[in-house]
Amino acid sequence: MLIIRNCALTLLACLLAGLTHAAPVVEDVATPDEAITKVWSAAKFLQNKGASGFATLNSKDGPWVWKDSYVFAFDCRLDRMVAHPMRPDLVGQPIMQITDNNGKYIFKEMCKAGSASPSRGGWVEYVWTRPGAGRVSRKLSYTFMTDIAFSTGIQVAAGVYDDKLSIDEVSKLTEKMADPAKYPAH
């Protein structure tokens, strides 16, 4: 009994000292349908606000940051990040040469995916540092092309960190959500 008590006290001490890494709580993990909804909402917001809406997208405390995800926006034609709440150092910078840890040109792929189906957008898989985790994880990002005043082809995107979902599965979800008869909430 003394051994069990000592083990429990040691575990408690480790938890209090922050020596263990807790897995994210399910409520703290963004889902693909949330990413799609946030991207569509942000695209509509930018259509209404124009370039002045980028300031809201850049805010870490704004409506476009939730759980472990965030909306960001970039201009493929001008090769520039236009809004990124977690990486303000990227705003205004060239993006086409940015690669993930596996050498994938992330933004080139996102530009292709978002432009391939302008009415639906598309998904890209890559590895990226997860906010708050400090480690690289598999990420699926949904990107959707929108036009705003004086600027065409702005890509609005958000991602989810997931080791199980396939691009095919999230693409089917996008199709379902884009059809109001099947998904009346949108």
Predicted feature descriptions by range:
Residues 2, 11-186:
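N-terminal membrane-sensor/transducer module of prokaryotic signaling receptors
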